[in-house]
Amino acid sequence: MKIKDVERYTIPLDVPYGGEALPDGKAPTGTTVEELIKALKKLPPKGLVSHDFGGNSRIIVTHYKPDIDPDCPFEAAMQQAIKEMASATWIPPQYFQ
């Protein structure tokens, strides 16, 4: 079984209203540089950055992990778990499959 070793993170961006003061006279709100830097520091340094400025403004960081073996040892782990369950319950392994 092959698995893809990818982590994907998203940072939502609160986009200010046009950059100028709002009609009610209040200053525009949005994601600050401080908030963005704080969020980026939590992510893997080797992550690849992309953006989505469609309806959802956000920064997307994709981290590929080459240090993990892509061959998933799922089947071997399941066989070992079946043997352990069989020995713990005194039931022959063929009844677990």
UniProtKB/Swiss-Prot annotation:
This is Gene 45 protein. It comes from Mycobacterium phage L5. The gene is 45.
